[in-house]
């Protein structure tokens, strides 16, 4: 059954509608067009090139209805025909988008008879028609030749059938091209993924990495040769490691463009001599040729000069004709190597900081065509991966160097951090006194009277008394060396030094022994706690975690939380790992992991931030009557609270010890405050501000109330044998509160290197003359108040306020000065010397100044405020109640 023309037309449309293989589709189109128009043969050209350089490429040529697909494709690829837009019949159709119907080909000047001469075929009629996409852009040209039904030319009916069929074919061709592009994109992505994997697999071998990238690029882009020039790496690596933590800049999308000028080239040509490595991959070779070109080699190579041009300008160069480009850029010399070179695609390779570290170069497409924008886009991805790979390799190499340097530094540090053999031998030979000699069992222990060697002996005694040396088979020489090494690794800061570590360890020892808390601990935990106490402030710099963060110190970058505590633990591990210092060497692996976990947790617990996190959970356990502390979490809580209790135990020492330690703490804090003002230009908090030193008593009271008392109170509730810590803290709170009240009355007390006395003492002698001191005395007539029945509505303001003393100092007041001043004042009041010493009178501060039963008759008040010189020996004020007045004055003084 024969199909009519309409049915055949629809059948042929269905034949091509779902075809996505571009070769098969084009073959079907030409065969079907031959059936519809009775054409002898046909050709199909596809549009290629850039907007400024478009041309037609013969996809299939001279296809008849009997030509097999394979033969047609093979012939087209073997004899690739390229027709620029505007040249020849097909070129004119592509340029004008207009159909051309030629009845006699040889009479048309646009016809090229060379093919007829080669094949012996005679072309008579030609019908050439454009193929457009849905946007109206040319995507191809179809051409049919000679009618087979006896007609000499294509008529209007043929033209209409041809046009209608090609309309549908245009849609099919565009779909097939899109499918082909998606397949290519998929393949490209697979290659890029493989390259990404290679970057990390080959990070220790730059040559293998670059060779693999070049091989993939050459195969994907179908070019003859591929080269990579690398800039002198020594000039680029100086800032790699410093910028590792910086956010890398995004690489900007680079569009290919023609480089027209070279005005700045010569000024920047110093870059030319920086190429030190050249990778070349050409022909069928799978291995790159790696060389180190000399300056002479670079200067006599046109390809190298073009690469230097790209490295200088930082722009991609897509050269269609090398000879023309070289003539336009006369600063580049043409050498013989470019005789066989036609097209070049050259692109800079940059690192994360957008610094040019090399140039990638593609030479000659296998098809003989110029490189397209699509080629440039794909090649850019290879250049980016090449840059990442080179950068990553450099970083890896530098990291390896840094690791080697770190090992050397650790070896040196370990050597210098370890105690000397002479010191160790001496400590081994020294006799170790009993624990009672050092007062180790007491919560009132102080190290003030111990020399440095005694502090080490005291530590050894604590280990012996806890039976740790024999229990865990610690070699005595190793223990001695470890103790000396720990002492050596404390810096000579004012408070957080070796002596502070000794005091913390002794408090832990006293809590375990005197406080009977050892019954709740295993021997391994006792070992870990004592080691943690001795190491909990190793290498302390006299500054806190907040200071490390503010200054962005390396420690703050290394440890984001509990900065110093993590550093202390790392220093502890470093000492233990040093030769001859591992006191845990005889432990089993399981015991070693357990004791190290205890040490780490205990040291980190000395961060008050950790204390505040754990405190509520501990308080809840105690309030619920917990008595079993053997669970892992509960034991960790208990050890953490014990570490904090030991760390702040100076607050529970006798007053003569506590206020000396407080002065050391204050001095260290003030030093940090000075650094914050100097380095950060910020105002430090009150406790670190030297200008607010008089507020220290008040801040000590706050510290006791917020941290110390709640902690010691809850520990004493559960473990009553450590009550001395709580009681000592209470007593010191009363002393600090007393000082705080005196400071509020205008007395300073911390102007000296030591604060042996709670009230400020100034240099002075008994013979110094009291002068330049003005004071004001206001006296209240107590009887007058009682006569008014307690109603003070008629009492003058200065009488209602009671007795007051105001001293204006123009110089420093010493104790002797104040004593003479008080004597002068008393003598001016009643002409007699005070019968009570200053120390005794200070105990009367709490006496009621408004006592209704005075021991002496009421006296008239002095009247209004009177101003006297300190050198005055008499007063017109009359007599007053001596005992009350003396108590008040001495309290104020």
Curated annotation (Swiss-Prot):
Q: What lineage, starting at the top, does this entry show?
A: Eukaryota, Metazoa, Ecdysozoa, Arthropoda, Hexapoda
Listed EC numbers: 3.1.4.35
Biased composition range(s): Basic and acidic residues = 789-800, 844-853
- The active site annotation covers 496
Q: How does it assemble?
A: Interacts with PrBP.
Which residues form the lipid moiety-binding region (S-farnesyl cysteine)?
890
Q: Which GO terms describe its molecular function?
A: 3',5'-cyclic-GMP phosphodiesterase activity; metal ion binding
The protein's required cofactor(s) are namely: a divalent metal cation
Query: Which residue stretches does the UniProt record annotate as biased composition, category Low complexity?
Result: 864-880
The protein depicted here goes by the name cGMP-specific 3',5'-cyclic phosphodiesterase
Binding sites annotated in the UniProt record for a divalent metal cation 1: 500, 536-537, 647
Swiss-Prot/TrEMBL GO biological process terms: cGMP metabolic process; signal transduction
InterPro entries reported for this sequence:
GAF, GAF-like_dom_sf, HD/PDEase_dom, PDEase, PDEase_catalytic_dom, PDEase_catalytic_dom_sf, PDEase_CS
Organism annotation? Drosophila virilis (Fruit fly)
Positions bearing Cysteine methyl ester? 890
Which cysteine-cysteine pairs are annotated as disulfide bonds in the entry?
none
Assigned keywords, A-Z: Cell membrane, cGMP, Hydrolase, Lipoprotein, Membrane, Metal-binding, Methylation, Prenylation, Repeat
